[in-house]
Amino acid sequence: MRVPVLITMLCCTPSFAQEALPAPTEFQYPLAVVAQSDGVVFVADRNLPGIWKIENGQKSVYFLASKKFRTPLNAVRCLAIDHQGKLLAGDSSTREVYRFDDAGLPQPLTKGWIGIPMALAVASDGTIYTADLELHRIWKMPAEGAAEPTEFAVINSPRGLTLDPDGNLWVLSTSSKDGQIQKVLPDGKIESVIKDHPFNLPHNIVRLDDGTMFVTDNYEHCVWKVSSDGKPEKFVSGAPLDRPVGLCRSGENLLVADPHIRTIFLLAPDKTLTVLVSSPVDPVATAAPVPEAGTPPTAPAK
C-alpha cells in the first residue's frame, strides 16, 4: 500500500521548481566588453553569470550560465571577436576558452588547459592568444582550438592583450619585474615597452593603429593614454568613472566597463564620456566576486 500512497503524494506536489524564472534584466557585475564591426556589443557579467548583448542601446541576455561551479561560463572573465566575427569567451570556472556557435551555444576550444583566462586577442589568420593569470603564461592556439595550446610567452601577472597590424602582441601586466607593458614579437621575443610601474591596478589594454594605447586602471579610477613612444598620462579620471575594468574599441571610440556602478561607457577621442547602457547600483550585487580555489593572490577589481 505504501507505493500507491507515495505516487499520489508525488503527483500532488506543486511543481514550483519547474516554474520558469523571469529573464534577468539588469547588470550584476559587468567586467568585460567587446564590440562587433556592426556595432553590436557583448558584455561579460561575472555575477550574473553570463553574457549580455547590447543592440540599439538595449541590453538582453545572450547567454545565461549556471551558478554551479565548474560549468561553462560560471566565471566568465574576458571576451573577444574572432576573425570570422564569432564571439569568444574565457572562463576560469572551467579553465576554458569558448567560441559561440550559430545556435548561440559555447563550444570549448581546449580541454581545460587554461588556468585563469583574463584576456583574449585574435590575429587576422584566426590565431588565438590567451593571457593566463594563474600560470603567468600567454597561450597560443589555432582558430579551431587545441587540446593543449602552445606556450607563447612567460610574463608575470598578464591581464590585458592587444595586437598590432604587424602581428606583435602587446601584453599588459600588473606586476612583472620587466615592466607593465611588454611587446611579444611573432617569433616569441619579448621587449619591454614600459619598464617601470606607473599603473596602480591595470586591467585591460587597447592599441590604436597609430601606436597609441589606452589602459584601464581600477585603483586610479581612470583610463590612461600611452603615447607611441611609451609615455603614459591619465586620459580621463574620476567621475563619472568609478573603477573601470573592461576596455575595447568601437569604431573611433572606446567602450569602458565599470562593474561597480554597473555601467558601460562610450569614451570619445575628445575625452567625452557618455553612458551606453547601465543598471541601478545595488551594493550587494556589485560586491567583488569571491575568489575561486587556485586564484593567485593578486588584488581583485575594486
Regions picked out by a protein language model, each given a short descriptive name:
Residues 4-14:
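Bacterial N-terminal signal peptides
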Residues 50-52, 96-98, 137-140, 180-182, ...:
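A short loop-to-beta-strand structural motif that recurs across blades of beta-propeller domains
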Residues 18-44, 48-52:
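An edge-strand/N-cap motif at the start of beta-rich repeat modules
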Residues 54-58, 100-105, 141-146, 184-189, ...:
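Short loop/turn segments that connect beta-strands within beta-propeller blades
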Residues 18-24, 60-69, 105-111, 147-152, ...:
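A short beta-strand motif characteristic of beta-propeller blades
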Residues 57-98:
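Mid-chain, structured segments of secreted extracytoplasmic proteins
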Residues 24-38, 69-84, 112-125, 155-167, ...:
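Beta-rich, blade/repeat-based domains predominating
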Residues 41-47, 87-93, 128-134, 169-176, ...:
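Conserved beta-strand positions in repeat-built beta-propeller and related beta-rich domains
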